[in-house]
């Protein structure tokens, strides 16, 4: 695991990251055991957990976000299946001290694969649809049978790679960055930033401080891991991309397998730790992961979470807990900027060329 390798290199131990990972793995095992009793045996359905549990950053008090992904024919039994799974998950969540998915979010129900794969962009690509698709790619774990998840992810990546305007032209590119995929990841990051402002208004400020800190930390980490996946196509896998996309016959399956194995089925912390090991400076890595460890330590404190949930917007400037977390997020941001724009010249060039315009 890359985070352990980075800890060893730096001679540090990030206890909050370690504890959250152990708790997450315990929760996934408990869920897997409970779902096995539900006899979720069809290859057309996969139970998927997302969010902090999929990132292996789950702590007591976190939301247990999940969805039943259906990749097959419509069946009236899908509704009772999802209801039974909901009851099972809620029982496990109660045992672990986890919360139900937000009723205003896209989780806690079933989703069909058709729009997730076919509606990328355009009017049919709703906020919910985009969220499910990008989180499937960046922070999802299958519980039990995962054939449906694997098929859907493969088809999503096929669309991004085979319909990329530059790759589809058959003309070799100067760089092997999958811009279609990268643009959708960037779009999602900007969407959740805008939605933060929208939710503060809609909910009259309820829970805004907790969402603010998560946006500064865990949401940003997820976004970084997606950008690194796209940039690594040029920095680490260019030769394989050229062979598969611009050879005698286009064949994206080896590329998809690579992306699934090294990125989609890894969590954001490990993806970022691996990148820091390969091309980051020691001091930048220390600042980045120290800040993230502090964030997870604070999120594991129920009194802190409760305070952030209840904090009034107008009182935030005088609240020491929120201001400390905000200052910590500035250290995290500073390290992220150094990593992308100072530590490595090739990464700096890609960030300047692809991440803004």
Residues covered by each model-derived region:
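Short glycine- and acidic-rich boundary segments immediately preceding or forming the N-terminal edge
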Residues: 1-24
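Active-site nucleotide-donor binding segment shared across nucleotidyl transfer reactions
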Residues: 32-81
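Amphipathic alpha-helical scaffolding segments
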Residues: 64-74, 81-88, 236-249
């Amino acid at each position: 695991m890359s985070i352990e390798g980075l800890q060893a290199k730096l001679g540090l131990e990030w206890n909050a990251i370690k504890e959250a990972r152990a708790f997450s793995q315990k929760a996934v095992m408990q869920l897997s055991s409970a779902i096995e009793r539900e006899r979720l045996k069809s290859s057309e359905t996969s139970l998927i957990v997302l969010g902090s549990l999929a990132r292996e950053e789950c702590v007591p008090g976190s939301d247990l976000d999940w969805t039943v992904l259906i990749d097959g024919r419509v069946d009236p039994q899908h509704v009772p299946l999802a209801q039974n799974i909901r009851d099972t998950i809620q029982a496990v969540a109660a045992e672990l001290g986890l919360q139900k998915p937000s009723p205003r979010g896209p989780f806690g129900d079933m989703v069909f694969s058709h729009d997730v794969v076919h509606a990328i962009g355009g009017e049919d690509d709703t906020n919910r649809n985009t969220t499910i698709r990008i989180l499937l790619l960046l922070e999802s774990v299958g519980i039990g049978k995962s054939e449906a998840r694997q098929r859907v992810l493969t088809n999503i990546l096929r669309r991004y790679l085979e319909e990329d305007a530059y790759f589809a032209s058959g003309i070799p590119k100067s760089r092997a960055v999958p811009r279609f995929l990268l643009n959708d990841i960037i779009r999602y990051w900007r969407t959740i930033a805008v939605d933060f402002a929208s939710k503060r208004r809609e909910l009259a400020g309820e829970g805004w401080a907790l969402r603010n800190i998560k946006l500064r930390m865990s949401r940003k980490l997820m976004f970084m891991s997606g950008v690194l996946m796209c940039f690594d196509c040029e920095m680490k896998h260019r030769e394989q991309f050229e062979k598969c996309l611009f050879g005698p016959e286009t064949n994206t399956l080896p590329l998809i397998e690579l992306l699934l194995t090294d990125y989609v089925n890894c969590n954001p912390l490990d993806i970022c730790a691996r990148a820091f090991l390969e091309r980051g400076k020691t001091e930048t890595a220390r600042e980045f992961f120290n800040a993230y460890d502090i964030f997870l330590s604070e999120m594991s404190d129920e009194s802190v979470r409760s305070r952030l949930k209840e904090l009034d917007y107008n009182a935030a400037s005088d609240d020491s807990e929120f201001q400390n977390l905000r200052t910590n997020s500035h250290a995290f941001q500073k390290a992220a900027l150094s990593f992308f724009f100072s530590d490595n010249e090739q990464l700096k060039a890609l960030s300047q060329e692809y991440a803004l315009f």
